[in-house]
């Protein structure tokens, strides 16, 4: 085990000098610095660059407070390794695989795997055309998710990405009954804490491993924590042959941390100040999140869109890797429609007649057509009013508004805030409800009866309460 000495510390960047004759550590190797002679507290560094003349530049995974020049640094000879296997279920980890849930720490002999690996080869990959039911109408009808697929939840600040991902955990993890891995990348600690206690109460935690590298962590930890969660998920897929659900909140923070690290390493920034290696880093992460012949990984990733600009390089780079996109729209939040999923901008590879069936496809296409036409008529309505529309257009607008409200529903995880019980709607019920609205069966019911409800039966019950 070769050793060097700290030459300089610049924030989270630590330069380490290895004497002549000492073997230099490889890129991505983990180095360890002990803060005192008793060797109780250590700081882990990851090698990022070799500067020449025995000097390597590293990124710290923890705060560098207390590090000084001349301190001894040991090369572990391998990348950061984290615990894997059944023992990780029900536990909460940080980027290094240390437990942070105040329960017993992992034993030294627990099985560990390095966080840096190659993606599965082309012939190992497997594709599926099985739909993953979420119980959320707007998703199941217009942008369905594939089992073993990749889903992106796009949205600006405060439009409901985390609430949607928590509802998906609530619905899918409980229905799915398999293994789930939740990775919190650079998000609020409070949200992670809420999610942990909620999962503990519901019992889902027993089949879930949680990994957190939150907003207050150094950029190195935020950049690598997604790989820690992915390594745990890969083990269940490859060794245990399981179907795994991988939730990542938020992929943008992974990019943001990479940008910070890139600047600290002295690389020339690229477009909008992002790192020049943006596409490579995203590709290395996303290509590992895949399904093989041994097992599947279904990933649901929240992706923050800076200033609601979808052309920003960070969300634009993520787009290329996804099977389904669920776009959250601020205008719908302003209308009080939750989840604020844009039915026209969201898309899915799975919305094809050979996958979802002819009836589902036809209903989804007609819903999109009606909403698109309503969108076109809104300018005329705003300038000239409803009176200038033909009778046919008035009927279409009335149905479009009912459809728009019926695409909303109350969430189980938001019940504590709204006071309204959440609902889970099976796909068959969703398709039937929208088909009947399109057929004009409920033209006589008030628009408000369609807002925030589950199935079409709930609409009828709500309308009866309103006196219709």
UniProtKB/Swiss-Prot annotation:
GO molecular function, one term: ATP binding
Keywords on record: ATP synthesis, ATP-binding, Cell membrane, CF(1), Hydrogen ion transport, Ion transport, Membrane, Nucleotide-binding, Translocase, Transport
Annotated organism of origin: Streptococcus pneumoniae (strain Taiwan19F-14)
InterPro entries per record: AAA+_ATPase, ATP-synt_VA_C, ATP_synth_F1_bsu, ATPase_a/bsu_AS, ATPase_alpha/beta_chains, ATPase_F1/V1/A1_a/bsu_N, ATPase_F1/V1/A1_a/bsu_N_sf, ATPase_F1/V1/A1_a/bsu_nucl-bd
Assigned GO CC terms: plasma membrane; proton-transporting ATP synthase complex
Signal sequence segment: none
Protein name: ATP synthase subunit beta
Membrane protein topology class: Peripheral membrane protein
Localization (cell): Cell membrane
Similarity section: Belongs to the ATPase alpha/beta chains family.
Predominant location: membrane
PANTHER family per the UniProt record, alphabetical: ATP SYNTHASE (PTHR15184), ATP SYNTHASE SUBUNIT BETA, MITOCHONDRIAL (PTHR15184:SF71)
Gene3D superfamilies the record matches: 2.40.10.170, Bovine Mitochondrial F1-atpase, Atp Synthase Beta Chain, Chain D, domain 3 (1.10.1140.10), P-loop containing nucleotide triphosphate hydrolases (3.40.50.300)
Protein residues bound to ATP: 155-162
Catalysed transformations (reactions): ATP + H2O + 4 H(+)(in) = ADP + phosphate + 5 H(+)(out)
Pfam (any one): ATP-synt_ab
Transmembrane segments: none
Function, in words: Produces ATP from ADP in the presence of a proton gradient across the membrane. The catalytic sites are hosted primarily by the beta subunits.
E.C. numbers: 7.1.2.2
Enzyme class: translocase
Oligomeric and partner information: F-type ATPases have 2 components, CF(1) - the catalytic core - and CF(0) - the membrane proton channel. CF(1) has five subunits: alpha(3), beta(3), gamma(1), delta(1), epsilon(1). CF(0) has three main subunits: a(1), b(2) and c(9-12). The alpha and beta chains form an alternating ring which encloses part of the gamma chain. CF(1) is attached to CF(0) by a central stalk formed by the gamma and epsilon chains, while a peripheral stalk is formed by the delta and b chains.
């Amino acid at each position: 085990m070769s050793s060097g000495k700290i030459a300089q510390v610049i924030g989270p960047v630590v330069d380490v000098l290895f004497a002549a004759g000492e073997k230099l550590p490889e890129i991505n190797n983990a180095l360890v610095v002990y803060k005192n002679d008793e060797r109780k507290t250590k700081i882990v560094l990851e090698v990022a660059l070799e500067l020449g003349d025995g000097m390597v530049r590293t990124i710290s995974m923890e705060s560098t407070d207390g590090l000084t020049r001349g301190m001894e640094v040991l090369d572990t000879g391998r990348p950061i390794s984290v615990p894997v296997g059944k023992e990780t279920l029900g536990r909460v980890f940080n980027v290094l695989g240390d437990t942070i849930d105040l329960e017993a720490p992992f034993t030294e002999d627990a099985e560990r795997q390095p966080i840096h690996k190659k993606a599965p080869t082309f012939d190992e990959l497997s594709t599926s055309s099985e739909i993953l039911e979420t119980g959320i109408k707007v998703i199941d009808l217009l942008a369905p998710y594939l089992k073993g697929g990749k889903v992106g939840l796009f949205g600006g600040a405060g439009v409901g990405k985390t609430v949607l991902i928590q509802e998906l955990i609530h619905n899918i993890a409980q229905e799915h009954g398999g293994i789930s891995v939740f990775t919190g990348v650079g998000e609020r600690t409070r949200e992670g804490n809420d999610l942990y206690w909620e999962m503990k109460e519901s019992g889902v935690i027993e089949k879930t491993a949680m990994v957190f590298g939150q907003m207050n962590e150094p950029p190195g930890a935020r950049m690598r924590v997604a790989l820690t969660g992915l390594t745990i998920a890969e083990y269940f897929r490859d060794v245990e042959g399981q179907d795994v659900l991988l939730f990542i909140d938020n992929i943008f923070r992974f990019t943001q941390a990479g940008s910070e690290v890139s600047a600290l390493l002295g690389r020339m920034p690229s477009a909008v100040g992002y790192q020049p290696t943006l596409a490579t880093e995203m590709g290395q992460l996303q290509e590992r999140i895949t399904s093989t012949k041994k097992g599947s990984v279904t990933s649901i990733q929240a992706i923050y869109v800076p200033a609601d600009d979808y052309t920003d390089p960070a969300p634009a780079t993520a787009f290329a890797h996804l099977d389904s996109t669920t776009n959250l729209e601020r205008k719908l939040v302003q209308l009080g429609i939750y989840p604020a999923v844009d039915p026209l901008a969201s898309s899915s590879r799975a919305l094809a007649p050979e996958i979802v069936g002819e009836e589902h496809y036809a209903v989804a296409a007609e819903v999109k057509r009606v909403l698109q036409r309503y969108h076109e008529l809104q300018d005329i309505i705003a300038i000239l009013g409803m009176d200038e529309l033909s009778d046919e257009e008035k009927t279409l607008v009335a149905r479009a508004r009912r459809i728009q409200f019926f695409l909303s529903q109350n969430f189980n995880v938001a019940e504590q805030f709204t006071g309204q019980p959440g609902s889970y709607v099976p796909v068959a019920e969703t398709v039937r409800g929208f088909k009947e609205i399109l057929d004009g069966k409920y033209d006589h019911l008030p628009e408000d009866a369609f807002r925030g409800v589950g199935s079409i039966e709930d609409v009828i019950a709500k309308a009866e309460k309103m006196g219709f």
